[in-house]
UniProtKB/Swiss-Prot annotation:
It is a peripheral membrane protein. Disulfide bonds: none annotated. This is UDP-2,3-diacylglucosamine hydrolase. Its EC number is 3.6.1.54. One of its GO terms (molecular function) is UDP-2,3-diacylglucosamine hydrolase activity. It is an enzyme of class 3 (hydrolase). Keywords: Cell inner membrane, Cell membrane, Hydrolase, Lipid A biosynthesis, Lipid biosynthesis, Lipid metabolism, Manganese, Membrane, Metal-binding. Binds 2 Mn(2+) ions per subunit in a binuclear metal center. The keyword Magnesium does not apply. Substrate binds at N78, R79, D121, S159, T163, K166, H194. InterPro entries: Calcineurin-like_PHP_ApaH (IPR004843), LpxH-like (IPR043461), Metallo-depent_PP-like (IPR029052), UDP-diacylglucosamine_Hdrlase (IPR010138). The keyword Lipid metabolism applies. The gene is lpxH.
Length: 240
């Protein structure tokens, strides 16, 4: 069994989500061969050198799962792209490139966070290119902690404001971009998060039937994609 999740947006202000994640680690994930986390794992991450006690507790829980034999793979999201190798080493997880193609359920599957599919959101795409530039990443990681905290708060506030102002079409994936990206990677299944619109979409790629599986965000309930001998099963679950 393989589990895939995304968009938990873990933060101290939402202990219900944190407890649900810890329950997953102590429960279903213990029986999984691997757990994939496809971005926006944390609501914000300003650097491995600034881990709070809350973030350290999450890191330690992940390490316990990793030590038990479940492989953990973590992909950057737009909220936590400053997660680095130090955190991954401590948590016992592997940092996964976005995009990545893996074998899943007997086929090649493309994994993405999903933000790069939203090409109609021109303002966001411009900001993403700026922030993900290697020079920008170096500067961000070397800013004083106080400056990083202020910048993180500013970016989160602006993101919420912009999301409310933009149409749903702009902040969703661009329909034409999906088959183009899937064809470029030679896959018929794509799994991503980011949009907070869980669903399984059918489409055609190079004249062949394909599917796009969108993981759900964790808010009032959690979401997970389970891949086993029964196939690909996307389903929500209630927080205990």
């Amino acid at each position: 069994m393989i589990l895939l999740i995304s968009d938990l947006h873990l933060q101290e202000e939402r202990p219900d989500i944190s407890r649900a994640f810890l329950d997953l680690l102590d429960g279903r994930a213990r029986h999984a061969k691997a757990l994939y986390i496809l971005g926006d794992f944390f609501e914000a991450w300003i650097g491995d050198d600034a881990m709070t006690p809350f973030q350290q507790s999450i890191c330690q829980a992940m390490r316990r799962l990793s030590d038990s034999g479940t492989a953990i793979y973590l992909m950057h999201g737009n909220r936590d792209f400053l997660i680095g190798q130090a955190f991954c080493d401590a948590a016992g997880c592997t940092l996964l490139s976005d995009p990545s193609v893996i074998e899943l359920g007997g086929e090649q599957v493309l994994l993405m966070h999903g933000d790069t599919l939203c090409t109609r959101d021109l303002g966001y795409m411009k900001m993403r290119r700026l922030l993900r530039n290697p020079l920008s990443l170096w500067i961000l990681r070397h800013l004083p902690l106080s400056s990083r905290y202020k910048l993180a708060r500013k970016l989160r506030s602006e993101s919420r404001t912009q999301t409310r102002m933009k149409s749903t079409e702009i902040v969703d994936v661009t329909p034409e971009e999906v088959p183009k990206v899937m064809a470029a990677h030679g896959v018929r299944t794509l799994v991503h998060g980011h949009t907070h619109r869980p669903a399984i979409h059918k489409l055609m790629v190079d004249g062949q039937p394909a599917r796009r599986i969108v993981l759900g965000d964790w808010d009032r309930r959690g979401w997970a994609l389970q891949v086993d001998e029964q196939g690909f099963q996307l389903a929500p679950f209630e927080f205990s």
